[in-house]
A protein has these predicted regions:
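Targeting-peptide/extracellular-domain and disordered-appendage signature
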Residues: 1-196
Length: 196
């Protein structure tokens, strides 16, 4: 079956099981060709940065599907940040799609499309747009991050091109991107004191 949020050939895959208390995320980092704009997007099943997930884990209710989020950070002149957490009722995953509330990720066999329909924080500005990641090549490398192999990382597309088109805020650019995934079978803080 799928591992590390990927198929055996390295392509993103969104239907991988996630252990209670665990996590799985897909991470995109991009910089515009002009160097003036950037973005980071993280799609979480079991948001490791969520105080609500941590609290649920402490109460013995660590269902990662009740703590899904699309974290979007836009850098440059039109900065925005989103991190709305959504429950199992507001998400859907299959091999090619991960729907988180009104937003979604979709792998079409060639590129990853991220439809962003979120609201910013702390100011509730709309954040609406589309990001397309076109991998230069796919990697099937899968690396354990701790001595027991409970936490793993894999670069999906270390070198990729990106197209960014947002209506809110008004942004259009192209640039270089990086795509990877991380997964864990237990809470991240059990193996790590800090995360860079």
């Amino acid at each position: 079956g799928p591992a590390g949020g990927r198929d055996a050939d390295g392509a993103p895959r969104f239907d991988q099981p996630v252990a209670p208390g665990g996590y799985l995320w897909w991470y995109v980092d991009a910089l515009s060709d002009c160097g003036n704009y950037g973005l980071t997007i993280i799609a979480f099943v079991g948001s490791v940065f969520s105080p609500y997930y941590r609290s649920a884990l402490a109460r013995g209710r660590g269902d990662p599907h009740n703590h899904c989020a699309l974290n979007v950070a836009l850098y440059g002149a039109k900065r925005r940040w989103t991190m709305t957490e959504r429950s199992r009722r507001s998400m859907m995953r299959d091999a090619q799609r991960f729907v988180i509330g009104p937003s979604a990720l979709h792998w079409d066999g060639q590129s990853l499309t991220i439809d962003v329909r979120e609201t910013g924080v702390p100011l509730p500005f709309p954040v609406r747009g589309k990001v397309r990641v076109h991998p230069g090549a796919l990697s099937s490398l899968h690396v354990p991050l701790d001595e027991h192999g409970r936490h793993r990382w894999g670069p999906i597309a270390p070198c990729a091109r990106v197209e960014v088109a947002f209506d809110n805020p008004a942004l259009r650019w192209q640039g270089h991107a990086y795509l990877d995934s991380n997964e864990g079978d237990e809470p991240i803080e059990r193996a790590f004191r800090e995360w860079d």
